[in-house]
């Protein structure tokens, strides 16, 4: 698990990178929760997401947003953090020029940043969005959502009420050409205390289905966009 440093618009950004042995392996970027509420790339959910992708032969990167850990800069209320995520994807693509696809995964604040990056980077073909803060941030930029993905949350989330996430999912489900799947973890709060195993089981089930459905993530997404599946 090499420690890496790459350059963002606010200076150096620290990360952890797992390279796949396959030159054409897909890329995954994992984004951590809110920097001002203890979010770092070493958060347990971020850490486990990282290994879910690594164990499926992705080249995967997690990193600290600006102002967190050894990453330079200061919290920028989302705009700068989106730039950090774009820089992370640029870095990963620069050392994986033959990558056959790209996924984005994020938890809470990181889910919001990840969905914004999804809109700006058409090469992102799949996403995992955990506890997206639909009541705290504007998600109307997802018009339309360009890729299929998974939204997962707990039904006892007091930070982001169940109804707000479900409302977001229902809006996205009306769009043609993509498939948005929703998973609800029973009795789970916003941080999935005591429920991380169930959370990861849902993530693994979805990701494996996407990979196996088309031989690799990219071909599965193409099938969904063309109306297959």
Describe every region a protein language model picked out.
Residues 172-191:
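Catalytic histidine neighborhood in serine/cysteine hydrolases
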Residues 1-23:
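N-terminal cap/lid segment of alpha/beta-hydrolase-fold proteins
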Residues 75-96:
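Alpha/beta-hydrolase active-site loop
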Residues 96-107:
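Alpha/beta-hydrolase fold nucleophile elbow
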Residues 106-114:
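Gly/Ala-rich beta-loop-alpha elbow adjacent to hydrolase catalytic centers
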Residues 145, 150-153, 157:
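Short beta-strand/loop motif that positions the catalytic acidic residue
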Residues 21-62:
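Short, surface-exposed "cap/lid" segments of acyl-processing enzymes
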Residues 155-160, 190-191:
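Acidic catalytic loop of the alpha/beta-hydrolase fold
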């Amino acid at each position: 698990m090499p420690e890496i440093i790459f350059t963002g618009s606010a200076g150096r950004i620290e990360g952890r990178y797992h390279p796949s042995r396959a030159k054409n392996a897909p890329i995954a970027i994992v984004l951590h929760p809110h920097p001002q509420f203890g979010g770092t790339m070493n958060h347990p959910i971020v850490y486990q997401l990282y290994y879910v992708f690594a164990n499926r032969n992705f080249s995967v990167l997690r990193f600290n947003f600006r102002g967190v850990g050894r990453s330079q800069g200061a919290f920028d209320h989302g705009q700068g953090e989106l730039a950090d995520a774009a820089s992370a994807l640029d870095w990963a693509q620069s050392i994986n020029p033959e990558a056959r696809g790209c996924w984005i995964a994020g938890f809470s604040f990181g889910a919001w940043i990840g969905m914004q990056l999804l809109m700006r980077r058409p090469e992102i073909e799949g996403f995992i969005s955990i506890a997206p803060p639909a009541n705290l941030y504007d998600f109307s930029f997802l018009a339309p959502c360009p890729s299929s993905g998974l939204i997962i949350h707990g039904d006892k989330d007091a930070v982001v009420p169940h109804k707000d996430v479900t409302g977001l999912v229902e809006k996205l489900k009306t769009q043609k050409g993509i498939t948005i799947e929703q998973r609800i973890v029973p009795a789970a709060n916003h941080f999935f205390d005591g429920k991380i195993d169930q959370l990861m089981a849902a993530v693994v089930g979805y990701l494996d289905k996407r990979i196996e459905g088309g031989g690799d993530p990219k071909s599965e997404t193409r099938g969904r966009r063309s109306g297959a599946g």
